[in-house]
Every structure is written in C-alpha cells, then in structure tokens.
Amino acid sequence: MQRYDPCPIVQQKITGAGAGVSLLLGRESKLLGALCHRRVREYPITGGPSTCCESFYDEKMIDEAYELLKSFHFTGLAMVEFKGDCILEVNPRVWGSFPMTEAAQSPIVAHYAQAAQGGQVTYTAKDYRTGVKMRFFLNDTVAALSYLKAGRVKEGLRGLGDFFTAKEALSAKGDGKVMRAYLKKSLFER
C-alpha cells in the first residue's frame, strides 16, 4: 500500500443487513419523530443505494441513533445508517429513502412543518405503518434482474414479485410530474 498511498485509510468490512433510522429532532435535540426501514434490495447488488426497502420498528436502534445525534446537539432531519450492529454513517439531511415517510404514513413531514412554525410536537413511538415496502421502479427492476443474473434466484424473483405490491417511491398522489421526470431522466439522460 505504501507505494500507492503513504497513509491509507483501512476500514473493517461490515456484513449484515442494512437499515436506517430516520429522525426529526427539534430545539434542544428533542425527539419529534422516528421511522425505521430495512434494505430489501440495493443496486449495485454488491453494495449501493436502496432500490427497495421496508418499514419496521426497532426501539433499540431508534434509541442508539437518537443518543448519537443528541450527543452533538443536532436539530433537524437526519438518517442514521446501520449495518448489523454498527453505525455506518449519518446523513444530516433529506436522504434517498425519505419517500418511505409518506409510504408508511409517518407524521415526520407534518411534525417538521409544525415545528418549523413554532408549534408544539410530541413524539409518539410506532406512529407509522410497519411492513410497508417501497421501491424505486427502474432501479429496483435492474436490481432484481442483477440478482437473477448473479444466480441469486430467490432474491431476484422476490424483486419481480414486489413489482406488484411495493409502493412506488416517486409516485405522488395527484401529481404524475415527479414520476414522469424520473422515468425521462432514467431512460433517456443517462
């Protein structure tokens, strides 16, 4: 390594299921909202962004993520990413799987708007639907096909099955512009 970089950064490879804890923290880092999701598929399949995820509830993960953000007096929206029992990163912003907040009927967005206007917001545990799958149509189709090509038939077929049951991440009620823009960019501008 010395030949390529005199001071390489060496990191441990972490295995296990990927999951995220989305949090909204108000003034004085008060917890105002939380939502957990697990990665179902990703692309590239060797490690990349979620193409399909599912909502679930894990109080321990929420507590760990909250204590971390609270320790540096964070305020706002953030997603803490876990792999197995390890925290990988913190995204202190709106993140890629943010549409899960709508798909799982989480009040995080409403709480954000209320808090921004100075309103009182109280956190309630498990205030969203669990077991809700959400996907990014094109990316998830490519992921499912990649699993099949790699010989991971069960995962690939499950992905094709989710085509009919998972909620579309970029489908907004009454507004097809978002989905049309996504399809146009994905199909013609890459």
Mark where each language-model region is.
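ATP-dependent carboxylate/phosphate-activation module, predominantly the ATP-grasp catalytic core
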Residues: 5, 12-73, 91-116
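A short glycine-rich, hydrophobically flanked beta-strand micro-motif that places a catalytic Asp/Glu
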Residues: 75-84
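Secondary-structure boundary/capping residues
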Residues: 77, 99, 121-122
